[in-house]
Amino acid sequence: MTQGGRKVGMPEMVLEYVLKQKGLDVGRDDPTHEVNVRTDVQFDVMAGVFASGQGDYVALFEPTASQVVSMNKGYIVSSLGQESGEIPYTCYSSLKSYMNENKDVLTKFTNAIKKGLEYVNTHTANEIANIIKPHFETNTIQEIETVVNNYKSIDAWPNTILLKEEGLNKLMDIMELAGELDKRAPYDKIVTKEYA
């Protein structure tokens, strides 16, 4: 049994996608399948539920995954991000009217994102860990550095903020496979390259 998180959340849909790409028979909350992905465990308690002995696998974000390892309650066996290939896991959207009326705000916002990506792609794990430490109060610098090294080892951070068409198509493939997308959106209708 595998804990996937909230039904149709990105972690759960990506987990299902990766398992199915590996040829496994996957069911949601259905133990009759080769892999039963539970969606009844709230995301914020998944690590604790797993550590208590429920489930064989769990999909966790960092630094939670590394904390489970440091508590000797599990191992990191794979990265869903690496296994799935490049997908636009985090995207920013706005109404067209907002875009038309606030180009300066969007330019500043996207420039800040670009600057952050440039930083993580050109600095050491230790430098990054020291910068982001205030946002991870319960983690040590060593834990954060381990997480950053894990991300760097799989090229988790892109080199551009541009949402590529291939990435959007893969995201829609994942959503279709999960039964959560009725109609695909045309790339040129929902993505702007103006700020990339």
Briefly describe each language-model feature range.
Residues 1-70, 85, 165-169:
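Bilobed "Venus flytrap"/periplasmic-binding protein-like clamshell domains
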Residues 25, 31, 78-80, 124, ...:
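Short, solvent-exposed coil/turn linker segments
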Residues 28, 59, 77, 142, ...:
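A generic structural-conservation signal
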Residues 42-136:
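Pocket-lining segment of extracytoplasmic ligand-binding domains
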Residues 95, 164, 192-194:
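Residue-level signal for threonine
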Residues 100-183:
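Secondary-structure end/capping motifs
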Residues 183-196:
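Hinge/cleft segment of the Venus flytrap/periplasmic-binding protein
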